[in-house]
Amino acid sequence: METSYFSRPIPLRFIILVTLAIHGPLLALQLPLTNSYDANFHVFFASHYAHHWFDPWNPKWFAGFSQTTYPPLAHQWIALLSYVFGLHMSFLLVQLAAVLLIPISVYKFARIWVEERAASYASLFSVFAGAVAFLVYSAGQLPTTLSAPLYLLALPYFYDWSRSADGKALIKGVTLTLAAAAVHHVTLIFGSVLFAIPVLWLAIIDRGQRSAAAVVIRGIIMAGIAGVGVGIVLLPYWIAIIKHPIEQMPIPHASRSNLLLNITYLTNYFFVPYGVLVIALPFVLWYGSAVKRLRPLMLGFWITFIFGLGGTTPIPRLVFRRAVAS
């Protein structure tokens, strides 16, 4: 019987304390507000909700525009807290909540793939993930860092419902999915393909004596319910986009470049987000391919990895066409 400390799972409470110890001081220094690209954009949206909760029309930019063109939930949480803490502190509190949710969601998501000890290590490593640091302190992407953990928390319920028809799992999974969509729709759109499909595949593998067709049908049912719910929750957004479709020229962005041709872009969009995980990539591909239960996850990771390389390969341009034009 193994008694080594490292052979036991790391308590989730300890991981949350580590997260708080690392990101708490950095957020207290207001680094996202002073150094990132988009943090103050989200504060600006929240400011409008704080002063005009039921009027989405914001006259302060572009001779006026509707804030329904961006999912509102993160901004509305900031607006609510701002009545007590002020806008800037409220942004930092919501961002802290998002950062604390990340290791929790990684643990819950990892548990459907691996045993408790491995899941706890995945959760701990997520605290130090370069992608999290980049999104929070450089990009200022509060909605992405809040929507992603909400969606990861929904996926284990999707697995439980698809595999065993657990009604409580259906309700919890749909609720978390709607919350994730109300924070950031694009994260949900990509996540539904790159994460939900591998989870459904795993539910089929783990079905036991159940019918594979029944598992797929239940997965489709939950996806359908969530889809209708997202349509309702984001109805103002869909109306705004249909009424005023995006017709501007694509804005050049370094993430869509060939990363191999520019060391700065390669560092910013590959080495920083992946960090030391770059060293583990060969093992990830080998082990993910060798273990049957991990193959769906490995395939989802591989597709995500290719898209994350931007214009380094022609695949993103072939799939998304104008959306990834440089």
Predicted regions and their residues:
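Perimembrane helix-loop-helix junctions
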Residues: E2-T3, F190-G227, H253-L259
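Hydrophobic alpha-helical membrane-interfacial segments at the cytosolic entry of transmembrane helices
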Residues: V18, R210-Y237, L297-I303
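Active-site lumenal/periplasmic loops and adjacent helix-entry segments of GT-C-fold
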Residues: P9-F14, A21-L152, P156-Y157, A179-V186
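Membrane-interfacial loop-to-transmembrane alpha-helix junctions, especially the N-terminal start
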Residues: P11-F14, A118-Y121, A169-K172, R218-A223, ...
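Hydrophobic, aromatic-rich transmembrane alpha-helices
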Residues: G229-I232, Y274-F307
